[in-house]
Amino acid sequence: MQDLEDAPASAELAATTAALLGEVDHRVKNNLQLIASMILLQQRRTEDEAARRALKSVLERVNAVATVHRRLFQGDPHLFEAADFLRDLTGDLAASAGRDDLQIELDLTPVAIPAASAAAFALVASELLANALKHAFPPGVGGRIVVRLTDEGAVCVLTIADDGIGMGAEAAGFGLTLAGLLAQQLHARLETAPADPLSDRPGVRATVRVPMPRSGGG
């Protein structure tokens, strides 16, 4: 009997919660769009090429966070489908790079990571892929980038590898530094090494092993 009496109150609470979440979604989305618009406007008005590149990088980071937010509110708010995000990210960054001479291969295992880790994971992936697109291949030099996500149970492993010119062009960049700091938020470590050490184009393999929470009570 008590359950029947509580049902209307529970339904009202659920409706109120849904309305509040919808309002939060709307406001966050609008704020991210406003930030992106301001960055884009400043980029278009800036004549210095280095400043334009820096603003483009910031815009890519904001867009990555916006994509995370959209996916969380459209799906399970507690879990983030990393493989689906990586498909979107790859398409967005490849289009932005405008490099028809680059081939990007995806090898993605479905992995759901906790929502609390979503933004850091997304930014790590964005930095690593953007770094490869920007620095691994000089103008006129094509190549291949592989984006791989695997589920090893206790960890999920993100690997982004290229067959570009190697670590000399990429090792000291801000993007890799930022990716390393963000990996620490995931209790992970960014590891970089030549993808093919014996080749005249050794490339770079960047790997992040992200610990996954255990399910169950053991």
What are these language model-derived features?
Residues 58, 67, 71, 78-95:
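Short beta-to-alpha transition helix within the HATPase_c
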Residues 153-177:
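Glycine-rich/acidic phosphate-handling loop/turn and adjacent ATP-lid/helix
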